[in-house]
């Protein structure tokens, strides 16, 4: 019989003359002959299981109308010519570049300049860097229809859609890495980080909810109402709710000072805070939506309310590279304003912003 195979790029190929007695190891050899995929790098997946080399096609009950996923792992990095000339032992240099490239992945949460780390390693071994860098390069993120195809492909392997989505989030939307997580499990350090982020988000949300709650003195929780009371008490002062500083009245409200401290201590809570404001103070939420830059500038100011930059004009500088990062995040299917807020809240770290958007981005879009 003829068996159909798919790789992770949705490319199909057919292996002929296969019988129920054909061993999986023999099947891999046929694939190597036809597709030049090394046997050692092949993983054949059917119904969510990795096929063992010593089993036969018949033991897995594979039928001709079915298809098998052929996953080819990345080759081990080889020693470059400059490295070989500098050292007589080939094996140690082969592992060194691999560690250099993986370093940005482990430190991505603390640094916003991962591209500089990769670029620094490139001159010493450009070929190796280009190969090993792919799994963590933001450009390898599957977006839009590409992501949908990747998810469907993994679902067709036999995995639950919820498991696939979880793996994609953990892999920052990288299909190759998500498949590895499905096969081997999500690394414990990533699970721990997600648990810590969830716990921190819950604690910050509780603190923020207390800040939004009415005070014991009977002051209204609605920030616009507080602003109106403040203006009535100080009618001699001109209102600053319009013009170049449409949200300037927030500086005089103690509860906003608390919200600002929460965001400065936990930037990942920005989206949750905006959702809370949308539920409890729709008028303020609309004003923030219409003036996102002014709102972000208020959040960036010092605790005493002084402006960090002169009023008027665009206060946040975005480089061409950062603009491209924002565009790529928008291609994931999120509103641009939400993307900008998440990107800035994550200290302009594209991978962290992507992960945060997949966790919380659609929640804000569902708000009325």
From Swiss-Prot:
Residue numbers bearing the Phosphoserine modification: 84, 87, 364
Biased composition (Low complexity): 76-88, 103-124
Pfam families: UBA (PF00627), ubiquitin (PF00240), XPC-binding (PF09280)
Residue numbers spanned by region Disordered: 76-134
One GO cellular component term: cytosol
Transmembrane segments: none
Cellular compartments annotated: Nucleus
Residues covered by the Ubiquitin-like domain: 1-77
PROSITE patterns (UniProt xref): UBA, UBIQUITIN_2
Organism domain of life: Eukaryota
Domain (UBA) ranges: 135-185, 320-360
Keyword terms: DNA damage, DNA repair, Nucleus, Phosphoprotein, Repeat, Ubl conjugation pathway
An MF annotation (GO) of this entry: proteasome binding
GO terms (BP aspect): ERAD pathway; nucleotide-excision repair; proteasome-mediated ubiquitin-dependent protein catabolic process
InterPro entries: Rad23 (IPR004806), STI1_HS-bd (IPR006636), UBA (IPR015940), UBA-like_sf (IPR009060), Ubiquitin-like_dom (IPR000626), Ubiquitin-like_domsf (IPR029071), XPC-bd (IPR015360), XPC-bd_sf (IPR036353)
Function: Involved in postreplication repair of UV-damaged DNA. Postreplication repair functions in gap-filling of a daughter strand on replication of damaged DNA. Protects ubiquitin chains against dissambly by deubiquitinating enzymes thereby promoting protein degradation.
Protein name as it appears in the record: UV excision repair protein rhp23
């Amino acid at each position: 019989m003829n068996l159909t195979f798919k790789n992770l790029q949705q490319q199909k190929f057919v292996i002929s003359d296969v019988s129920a007695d054909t061993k999986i190891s023999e099947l891999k050899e046929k694939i190597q002959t036809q597709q030049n995929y090394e046997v050692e790098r092949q993983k054949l997946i059917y119904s969510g299981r990795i096929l063992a080399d010593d089993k036969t096609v018949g033991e897995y009950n594979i039928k001709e109308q079915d298809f098998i996923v052929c996953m080819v792992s990345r080759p081990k990095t080889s020693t470059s010519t400059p490295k070989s000339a500098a050292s007589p032992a080939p094996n140690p240099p082969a592992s060194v570049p691999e560690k250099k490239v993986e370093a940005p992945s482990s430190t991505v949460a603390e640094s916003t300049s991962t591209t500089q780390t990769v670029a620094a390693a490139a001159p010493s071994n450009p070929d190796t860097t280009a190969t090993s860098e792919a799994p963590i390069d933001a450009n390898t993120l599957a977006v839009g229809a590409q992501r949908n195809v990747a998810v469907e492909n993994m679902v067709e392997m036999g995995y639950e859609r919820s498991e696939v989505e979880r793996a994609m989030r953990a892999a920052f939307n990288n299909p190759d890495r998500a498949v590895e997580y499905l096969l081997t499990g999500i690394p414990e350090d990533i699970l721990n980080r997600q648990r810590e982020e969830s716990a921190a988000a819950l604690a910050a949300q509780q603190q923020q909810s207390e800040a939004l709650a009415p005070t014991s003195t009977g002051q209204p929780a609605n920030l616009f109402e507080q602003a109106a009371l403040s203006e009535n008490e100080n009618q001699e002062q001109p209102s600053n709710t319009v013009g170049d500083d449409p949200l300037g009245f927030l500086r005089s409200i103690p509860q906003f000072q608390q919200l600002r401290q929460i965001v400065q201590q936990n930037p990942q809570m920005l989206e949750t805070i905006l959702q809370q404001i949308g539920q409890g103070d729709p008028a303020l939420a609309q004003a923030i939506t219409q003036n996102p830059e002014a709102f972000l500038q208020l959040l960036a100011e010092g605790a005493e309310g002084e402006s960090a930059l002169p009023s008027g004009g665009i206060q946040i500088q975005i480089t061409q590279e950062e603009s491209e990062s924002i565009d790529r995040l928008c291609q994931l299917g999120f509103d641009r304003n939400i993307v900008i807020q998440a990107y800035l809240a994550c200290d302009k770290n594209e991978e962290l912003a992507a992960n945060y958007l997949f966790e919380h981005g659609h929640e804000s879009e569902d708000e009325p």
